[in-house]
């Protein structure tokens, strides 16, 4: 899967599926599920590294986890999902050269074929244009942007006409800057539908209704592995509970075997 193929999927009316992965095991599961795109999201800061937000994760850590994702795939390269890697906080907000170095490192030394950036500020648009000129595909991200948690929080975005008009303008700017797709998170379905209709590039929703060109989800949330999930991403199974019960069963069985062994007739020790 190549970035340019996602636009064709939109034109064909086929929903685009994106799931996150953070190591080889999760990558193998997502690949087997048939997802079009694997996102190595900076959400791994919380899912895999137990941070409270996405902010602490570094470029080096993103590279480490993306390399692990690549090793988890089992299919030949042409049949593998497209891998998009998040550029973490302050890896692209501090200048174009730093952004090019970070994105270039991810594409050179891992299976990533594209990067994702949050926001549409003038500085971010300039970075996107520079990356695209350098041959690095870029996915945009508007709405709830976790890297801006201290400014915006986790509340739903674009709820009034003024902010919706601003989002539409920003989305068009991102498309013009060269983004091949756009993620919109935790926004009303009406604005997501409008974006999908007015943009040529695919609009991928998470908590943005069902009228987008595709959907992205954090795999650990869908599997119920995280302690809690966002209201717009309910779990499909209670994976955390199932795993704990299975491991508890093993521990219990081990203890029972030990108790049984102590109550049986002892056998003479063999000569060593």
Curated annotation (Swiss-Prot):
3-methyl-2-oxobutanoate binds at residues 42-43, 86, 116. It holds the Pfam family Pantoate_transf. Mg(2+) binds at residues 42, 86, 118. Its main location: cytoplasm. It is an enzyme of class 2 (transferase). Keywords: Cytoplasm, Magnesium, Metal-binding, Pantothenate biosynthesis, Transferase. Pathway: Cofactor biosynthesis; (R)-pantothenate biosynthesis; (R)-pantoate from 3-methyl-2-oxobutanoate: step 1/2. It is found in: Cytoplasm. The active site is at residue 185. One of its GO terms (cellular component) is cytoplasm. It comes from the Bacteria. Its cofactor is Mg(2+). Catalyzes the reversible reaction in which hydroxymethyl group from 5,10-methylenetetrahydrofolate is transferred onto alpha-ketoisovalerate to form ketopantoate. NCBIfam families: panB, PRK00311.1. This is 3-methyl-2-oxobutanoate hydroxymethyltransferase. The gene is panB.
């Amino acid at each position: 899967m190549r970035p340019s193929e996602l636009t064709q999927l939109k034109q064909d009316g086929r929903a685009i599926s994106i799931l996150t992965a953070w190591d080889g095991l999760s990558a193998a599961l997502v690949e087997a599920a048939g997802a079009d795109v694997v996102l190595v999201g900076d959400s791994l800061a919380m899912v895999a590294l137990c941070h409270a937000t996405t902010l602490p994760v570094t470029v080096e850590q993103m590279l480490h986890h993306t390399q692990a994702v690549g090793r988890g795939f089992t299919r030949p390269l042409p049949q593998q999902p497209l891998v998009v890697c998040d550029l973490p906080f302050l890896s692209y907000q501090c200048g174009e050269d730093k952004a090019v170095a970070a994105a270039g490192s991810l594409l050179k030394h891992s299976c990533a074929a594209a990067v994702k950036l949050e926001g549409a500020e003038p500085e971010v648009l300039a970075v996107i244009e520079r990356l695209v000129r350098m041959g690095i595909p870029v996915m945009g991200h508007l709405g709830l942007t976790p890297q801006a948690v201290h400014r915006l929080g986790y509340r739903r975005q674009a709820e009034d006409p003024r902010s919706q008009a601003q989002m539409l303008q920003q989305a068009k700017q991102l498309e013009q800057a060269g983004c091949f797709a756009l993620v919109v998170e935790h926004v009303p379905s009406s604005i997501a539908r409008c974006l999908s209709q007015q943009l040529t590039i695919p609009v991928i929703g998470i908590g943005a209704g069902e009228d987008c060109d595709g959907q992205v989800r954090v795999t650990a949330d869908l599997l119920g592995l995280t302690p809690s999930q966002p209201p717009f991403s309910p779990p499909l199974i209670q994976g955390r509970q199932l795993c704990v019960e299975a491991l508890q069963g093993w521990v219990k069985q081990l203890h029972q075997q030990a108790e049984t062994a102590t109550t049986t007739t002892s056998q003479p020790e063999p000569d060593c």
